Amino acid sequence: MEDFVRQCFNPMIVELAEKAMKEYGEDPKIETNKFAAICTHLEVCFMYSDFHFIDERGESIIVEPGDPNALLKHRFEIIEGRDRTVAWTVVNSICNTTGVEKPKFLPDLYDYKENRFIEIGVTRREVHIYYLEKANKIKSEKTHIHIFSFTGEEMATKADYTLDEESRARIKTRLFTIRQEMASRGLWDSFVNPREAKRQLKKDLRSQEPCAGSPTKVSHRTSPALKTLEPMWMDSNRTAALRASFLKCPKK
């Protein structure tokens, strides 16, 4: 699973996921399913935001990479993936500027067009079950919830899906392709079933013990499906700016 994650996701997303896990004392090399889940969630947050801008009239527009009108304001502020201290600073700044209610939990995004925080969910289970869990945890009607599944289903607060159908389809296609590629590698079942994943982890650790010092052969062959997984959707200019912002540790 770790090899799959490193091949599948943008290096910045992998780095952010590793940083987040290490912040909580978790090892991406051991908790590989969680590593994959965090990377997936981060990528959906970025895809949700990418290419969406607000024009001078306050209307939401989509601008493709390389478009000369790149000086527009991004519609979404990405909060997920930032250092917690920085993330809360961003949230407080938004609340002070817009007057929106401060959330009790860190949200994933802020929508400048609709003036609301957004909680993004990516689930391997039924979307309505995960939606209710999120809603019960947040306990705020001010934070908008949008849940995606690996099967193409989605659920959002008051059936308001925020994005246009094409943008949402892009996210659903990406998730479905990740699922298909995991399945082709025999990784999907353990990703869905945590108990099976733990059993597999113990089995893998036992099999590695006798030859811990020997080199590991890693296949670098890229399957046709994985080629479609390569994350080409990210705006390179924004990626560089986000990388500098997200990975910069605050001084203590």
From Swiss-Prot:
Residues 202-223 are annotated as: Disordered. Its main location: host cell. Signal peptide: none annotated. The keyword Chloroplast does not apply. The keyword Nucleotide-binding does not apply. GO terms for molecular function: RNA binding. Gene3D superfamilies: Influenza RNA-dependent RNA polymerase subunit PA, endonuclease domain. The probable endonuclease active site in the N-terminus and the basic amino acid cluster in the C-terminus are important for the shutoff activity. The C-terminus acts as a nuclear localization signal. The C-terminus is recruited to host protein complexes involved in nuclear Pol II RNA processing. This is Protein PA-X.
